[in-house]
């Protein structure tokens, strides 16, 4: 029997019944009654969890009578706004308008069932994935003990390529040399260590785990900057630091390991550049740097369509909560946090007010459309200049418009252009001392043209160029004379 049929056909029994007292043909109905009770309890929990997201929802006046005719339970479900956690508001209004009474009752019953399944129930759901608490290691891919490292080779970056300028073979970020241990970073006086974090466990979308290897394989990093004519790999000591291990069964265990590895990298003096992976890895990336430099000792510049400040969800570690967790745990200061490019369904009145209360300087696409990108970028630059000397730069590729980044895990329309984004990143990475960088949420399988990977590499390269321009002693917006004029009349 379909869920809607169960809900439509049930009638409350005159006295409490036990399944053992029922004939076989009535047991299904009795079990459905128990199911209804459970769903009503779960619905109540869902209402409490969704109060922030549905705070602005009210039933249109012309549909109020139709909703009242559905009965108390269905009416409460619709009026609470819990239904719009399952279907879009516009679709719900359409269904309330066009369906007859029986069809509408059946639909609402189905929505209540779905809503109940979405909520967390201690009786049905585990609070966490069971872990072996006696295990003393992160995973089977345990890092090589320090005592065994000297037996392999001398410390320092090394090449895995047969040719000096390889176009094939083992792919590395920008064709860079490889480093494996902190000793390699120290011996090579490495400026930037680029590491993959192939995690997509913290997102409802998949394939972000493929992004590090796809960005390596396309090999469009380390290109010369046409503005300053600086070649970042000639100015900086850059290495491919490999992929960090992730636990594909536990985001929590992955978060701890990534934070430890980022902290270890930062202690060598190299800038950890993380290539994700989903945006849940923003939290351990920033936490790892803070472990080394100190909490609230640096600013965070976050380019994204999403505020990542969900406070009412079932989970506490996901790609929708990284900024909330960083602020809640006091790892970063709200006054030193800047967000650019916000748009989409997560940008609501409740979230923006919360960000404002935390002191976060956010810039939505509404602001950019009203005032123009250059004016808003100027405001962002001033905010960065007034901020700490050190900055962590984070880029969720959803900041870009779908025309230039269709492979974003949580794609949103009407975003920034690639030239706008790289211009902003290049400037900030040249104007401030970058202590960490990460790019996340690229899902390569969504774009067979490779345009999204090309643009993701361009974003990473923009920060490398900015760091190289700063190390070269140039002003952030330095332009080489040859790049401006061919010298002929």
Role assignments for model-derived ranges:
Residues 31-40:
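Bacterial N-terminal signal peptides that target proteins for export
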Residues 51-54:
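Sec/Tat signal peptide C-region and signal peptidase I cleavage site
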Residues 41-49:
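Bacterial N-terminal signal peptides
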Residues 56-194, 199-489:
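Conserved alpha-helical scaffold segments that buttress catalytic/binding sites
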């Amino acid at each position: 029997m379909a869920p809607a049929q169960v809900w439509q056909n049930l009638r409350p029994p005159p006295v409490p019944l036990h399944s053992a007292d029922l004939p076989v043909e009535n047991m299904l109905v009795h079990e459905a009654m128990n199911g209804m009770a459970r769903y009503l309890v779960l619905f109540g929990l869902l209402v409490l969890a969704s109060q922030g997201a549905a705070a602005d929802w009210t039933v249109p006046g012309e549909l109020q009578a139709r909703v009242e005719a559905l009965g108390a339970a269905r009416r409460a479900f619709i009026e609470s706004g819990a239904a719009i956690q399952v279907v879009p508001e516009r679709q719900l209004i359409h269904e309330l308008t066009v369906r007859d009474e029986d069809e509408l009752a059946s639909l609402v019953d189905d929505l209540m069932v779905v809503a109940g399944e979405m909520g967390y129930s201690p009786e049905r759901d585990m609070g966490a994935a069971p872990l072996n608490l006696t295990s003393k290691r992160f995973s089977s891919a345990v890092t090589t003990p320090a005592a065994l490292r000297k037996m392999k080779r001398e410390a320092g970056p090394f090449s895995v390529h047969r040719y000096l300028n390889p176009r094939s073979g083992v792919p590395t970020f920008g064709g860079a040399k490889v480093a494996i241990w902190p000793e390699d970073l120290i011996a090579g006086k490495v400026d930037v260590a680029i590491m993959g974090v192939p995690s997509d466990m913290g997102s409802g979308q998949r394939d972000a785990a493929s992004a590090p290897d796809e960005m390596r394989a396309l090999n469009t990093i380390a290109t010369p900057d046409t503005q300053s004519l600086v070649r970042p790999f000639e100015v900086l000591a850059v290495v491919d630091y490999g992929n960090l291990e992730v636990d594909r069964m536990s985001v929590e265990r992955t978060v701890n390991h990534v934070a430890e590895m980022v902290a270890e990298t930062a202690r060598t003096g190299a800038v950890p550049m993380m290539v994700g992976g989903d945006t849940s890895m923003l939290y351990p990336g920033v936490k790892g740097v803070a472990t080394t430099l100190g909490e609230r000792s640096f600013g965070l510049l976050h380019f994204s369509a999403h505020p990542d400040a969900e406070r009412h969800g079932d989970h506490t570690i996901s790609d929708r909560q990284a900024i909330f967790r960083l602020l809640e745990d006091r790892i970063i200061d709200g006054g030193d946090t800047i967000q650019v490019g916000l748009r989409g369904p997560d940008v609501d009145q409740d979230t923006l007010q919360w960000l404002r209360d935390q002191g976060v300087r956010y810039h939505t696409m509404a602001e950019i459309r009203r005032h123009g990108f250059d004016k808003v970028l100027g405001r962002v630059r001033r905010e960065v200049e007034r901020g700490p000397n050190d900055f962590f730069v984070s880029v969720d590729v959803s900041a870009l418009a779908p025309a230039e980044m269709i492979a974003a895990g949580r794609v949103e329309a009407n975003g920034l252009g690639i030239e706008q984004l790289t211009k902003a990143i290049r400037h900030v990475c040249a104007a401030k001392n970058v202590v960490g960088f990460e790019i996340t949420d690229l899902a390569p399988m969504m774009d067979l043209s490779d345009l999204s990977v090309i643009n993701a590499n361009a974003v990473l390269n923009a920060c490398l160029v900015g760091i190289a321009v700063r190390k070269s002693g140039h002003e952030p917006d330095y332009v080489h004379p040859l790049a401006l004029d061919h010298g002929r009349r």
